[in-house]
Amino acid sequence: MIQMQTILNVADNSGAKKVMCIKVLGGTHHMIAHLGDVIVVSIKSSIPKGKVKKGEVCKALIIRTKCGVTRSDGSNIKFDSNDVVLLNKQGEPFGTRIFGSVPRELRVKKFSKIVSLAEEVL
């Protein structure tokens, strides 16, 4: 469960390392984001010569959460950290690689480009 002011790790090679959630998109009463939701983030730390700089505001897709998600077969999948992938204005990822594994629930939510860039799909 991701809410405003949550610090998240970035799981792609866009140049950002840490981001902070400043808005959860999806309506007026949508206050908590889960796996596969799009949020607005502010870049808190980045590497030099990256595609994004510290202080920039952009959208991000949540690909891993500590809270986890329950699948239809009853299994539960959790991760060790809260991670996102940065998106541009068209909804495509900034980076060309995604580090770590992503759940297959992202394919159902129409993010097949991100699933194809990932190292492993759970």
Swiss-Prot record:
Keywords of this entry: Ribonucleoprotein, Ribosomal protein, RNA-binding, rRNA-binding
Mention one GO molecular function: structural constituent of ribosome
Cellular component terms (Gene Ontology): cytosolic large ribosomal subunit
Q: Which GO terms describe its biological process?
A: translation
Task: List the SUPFAM superfamilies.
Answer: Ribosomal protein L14 (SSF50193)
PROSITE patterns in UniProt? RIBOSOMAL_L14 (PS00049)
Q: State the superkingdom.
A: Bacteria
Give start-end of the signal peptide.
Answer: none
List the InterPro entries. Answer: Ribosomal_uL14, Ribosomal_uL14_bac-type, Ribosomal_uL14_CS, Ribosomal_uL14_sf
The entry's function note states: Binds to 23S rRNA. Forms part of two intersubunit bridges in the 70S ribosome.
Family recorded in the similarity comment: Belongs to the universal ribosomal protein uL14 family.
| Assembly notes | Part of the 50S ribosomal subunit. Forms a cluster with proteins L3 and L19. In the 70S ribosome, L14 and L19 interact and together make contacts with the 16S rRNA in bridges B5 and B8.
NCBIfam families in the record = rplN_bact (TIGR01067)
Its protein name is: Large ribosomal subunit protein uL14
The species this protein was found in: Orientia tsutsugamushi (strain Boryong)
Q: What is the lineage of its organism?
A: Bacteria, Pseudomonadati, Pseudomonadota, Alphaproteobacteria, Rickettsiales
